[in-house]
UniProtKB/Swiss-Prot annotation:
Domain of life: Bacteria
PROSITE patterns: HSP70_1, HSP70_2, HSP70_3
Residues covered by region (Disordered): 614-642
Phosphothreonine: residues bearing it: T201
HAMAP family linked: DnaK (MF_00332)
Species this protein is from: Francisella tularensis subsp. tularensis (strain WY96-3418)
Protein name: Chaperone protein DnaK
Alphabetized UniProt keyword annotations: ATP-binding, Chaperone, Nucleotide-binding, Phosphoprotein, Stress response
Gene that specifies this protein: dnaK
MF annotations from Gene Ontology: ATP binding; ATP-dependent protein folding chaperone; unfolded protein binding
Keyword Magnesium applies: no
Organism taxonomic ancestry: Bacteria, Pseudomonadati, Pseudomonadota, Gammaproteobacteria, Thiotrichales
Function in brief: Acts as a chaperone.
Induction: By stress conditions e.g. heat shock.
């Protein structure tokens, strides 16, 4: 059985870890970095760039560079949160798919589901793991924000499938961080608050770590959060400030200039990072735009105090879920023994200060906020494969689950923060006399009104025997697996007839859609390999042409005119082949040049060998002239007179 890798699929950055013996190890990507930007770009030449390479060209290719896709995954286009993101001027197109989901589109009009784009990031992670391990990788544990709903979890699993990974478990990010901390911690029973402020999402989980019969038991008591609050919002606040200041100075609004907007976005992110350690920074963007009077430059000084005033409401927004999580766990702030900070945005001093004020204790600084989640995912992978023993993980469902009942009310079957896996049943009946069928409308959320909650799916239980209203007994069962993914069944107790629904297409993608995307991905991988092989063949050919011509020049008169002509002809034919896309033709002409040059190389080598032998013979005679030379040991003697 191969390794089960751990992947933190982040909004801004992603991270990969594997179990190396008894410890989890973060693996560097091909560029030598421990995290990979969650950015995917589609170039004019048809190449797909992922990570740093995609991020680097974002300014010149804003329409086809996709970032923060995690904020769209498993969401409907008409969701208020999605509409707000579109208003925030993401440079790429967000469109409404036929099924109502939020998809993205390239400037050429190619439509893609968010799981399809995220799969490119996962594929890079998979390749990194395979390069490190030297063996195929087919299984993974992938993390999601604790507050992700069923659709978002399923869409994440779909992304894994498209990337060629069997997702063995979906695990909540704060839980993974606690797992990473809990495995290293040997302090007995602890109640830990995991404050996870990442690039696009915020989670707070209250977790109990205890030693139960020698096992390290990690139990989630409660979780809460906001799936539209993260570092991207902090960047946006600073970006809008810079654009507003520039407009005041120059009278030009950069909001409608995609290239300028992308430059300001990147500068805002860089300034935000600098202000975590410096009191002020200069944002300097020369030639940001131009008008009739000439080019314009953006040069604005930003102090830490100014930046904190711009984002203080975002930081305060994160504290409300903290209160709710404590209430749901039935605990007070004084019951918390440790506070863990996870996610890159927690490096901001204001965030650390407000978390310290809220919980009344200093947050721990020994947990790497960028890597802890991936490490926890790798440990969970180790647990599932049997490589890691003595760990018991008890997670919870973040949102209540139920069905719509008479009057448009949501009746909850499973309350939020219920430990999973779990199974609950409840008996319902008909609303009218002789009702032949009932529609089971499955909902997720906390509102009383059914329409205000997230609809996960509908199905009908038909052929109910005629009976007065309230008489038939319809047993509805909700079954949540360890990934937090739901199965619902309805059974007529009188007839035994049963109907069920696995809420597996709530991501909006059918099995056929996913299979097509898997095939597209495989085709792309094949195309990428062909492109790579073609470039390798061209490079080999170019090197051979260069070395052949150089050798002919150096050998000079030792090569006949006929030989020179033959080599030059072969070089020209190979040059012509490298301008085309036929790898086999390039390789054939490369072989022809090698064969043409081989006799010359052999002749040159033989002449060099003869010269070396002759020179060696002369040198061998030289020592005979100095037969009176005596070998002696020398001893260094310090000169005291120095």
């Amino acid at each position: 059985m191969g390794k089960i890798i751990g992947i933190d699929l982040g909004t801004t950055n992603s991270c990969l870890a594997i179990m190396d013996g008894k410890t989890a190890k973060v693996i560097e990507n091909a560029e030598g970095h421990r995290t990979t930007p969650s950015v995917v770009a589609y170039t004019d030449s048809g190449e797909i760039l992922v990570g740093q390479a995609a991020k680097r060209q974002a300014v010149t290719n804003p329409d086809n560079t996709f970032f923060a896709i995690k904020r769209l995954i498993g969401r409907k286009y008409d969701d208020k949160a999605v509409q707000e993101d579109i208003k925030k001027k993401v440079p790429y197109a967000v469109i409404k798919a036929d099924n109502g989901d939020a998809w993205v589109a390239t400037k050429e009009g190619k439509k893609m589901a968010p799981p399809q784009v995220s799969a490119e990031v996962l594929r890079k992670m998979k390749k990194t793991a395979e390069d490190y391990l030297g063996e195929p990788v087919t299984e993974a544990v992938i993390t999601v924000p604790a507050y992700f709903n069923d659709s978002q979890r399923q869409a994440t699993k779909d992304a894994g499938k498209i990337a060629g990974l069997e997702v063995k478990r979906i695990i909540n990010e704060p839980t993974a961080a606690a797992l990473a901390y809990g495995v290293d911690s040997k302090k007995g029973e602890q109640t830990v608050a995991v404050y996870d402020l990442g690039g696009g999402t915020f989670d707070i989980s209250i977790i109990e770590i205890a030693d139960v019969d020698g096992d390290n038991q990690i139990e989630v008591l409660s979780t809460n959060g906001d799936t539209f609050l993260g570092g991207e919002d902090f960047d946006l606040a600073l970006m809008n400030y810079l654009i507003d200041e520039f407009k005041k100075e120059q009278g030009i609004d950069l909001h409608n200039d995609k290239l300028a907007l992308q430059r300001v976005r990147e500068a805002a992110e860089k300034a935000k990072v600098e202000l975590s350690s410096a009191q002020q920074t200069d944002v300097n963007l020369p030639y940001i735009t131009a008008d009739a009077t000439g080019p314009k430059h953006l040069n604005i000084k930003v102090t830490r105090a100014k930046f904190e005033s711009l984002v203080s409401d975002l930081v305060m927004r994160s504290l409300e879920p903290c209160k709710k999580a404590l209430e749901d766990a039935g605990l007070s702030k004084s019951d918390i023994t440790e506070v863990l900070l996870v996610g890159g945005q927690t490096r901001m001093p204001l965030v650390q200060e407000k978390v310290k004020e809220f919980f009344g204790k200093e947050p721990r600084k020994d947990v790497n906020p960028d890597e802890a989640v991936a490490v926890g995912a790798a440990i969970q992978g180790g647990v599932l494969s049997g490589d890691v023993k003595d760990i018991l993980l008890l997670d919870v469902t973040p949102l209540s689950l139920g069905i719509e009942t008479m009057g448009g009310v949501m009746t909850k079957l499973i309350e939020r923060n219920t430990t999973i896996p779990t199974k609950k049943s409840q008996v319902f009946s008909t609303a009218e006399d002789n009702q032949p069928a009932v529609t089971i409308h499955v909902l997720q959320g906390e509102r009383e009104m059914a329409s205000a909650n997230k609809s996960l799916g509908r199905f009908d239980l038909a052929d109910i025997p005629p009976a007065p209203r309230g008489m038939p007994q319809i047993e509805v069962t909700f079954d949540i697996d360890a990934n937090g993914i739901l199965n619902v069944s309805a059974k007529d107790k009188a007839t035994g007839k049963e109907q069920n629904i696995v809420i597996k297409s709530s991501s909006g993608l059918s099995e056929e859609d996913i299979e097509k995307m898997v095939q597209d991905a495989e085709a792309n991988a094949e195309a990428d390999k062909k492109f790579h092989d073609l470039v390798t063949a061209r490079n080999t050919a170019d090197n051979l042409i260069h070395s052949s011509r150089k050798a002919i020049q150096e050998l000079g008169d030792k090569v006949t005119a006929a030989e020179k002509e033959k080599i030059e002809e072969a070089c020209k034919e190979l040059e012509a082949a490298t301008k085309g896309d036929d790898k086999q033709a390039i390789e054939a002409k490369t072989k022809a040049l090698e064969e043409a040059f081989a006799p010359i190389a052999q002749k040159a080598y033989a002449e060099q060998a003869q010269a070396a032998v002759a020179q060696g013979g002369a040198k061998a005679e030289e020592p005979k002239k100095e037969e009176d030379v005596v070998d002696a040991d020398f001893e260094d003697v310090e000169d005291d007179k120095k």
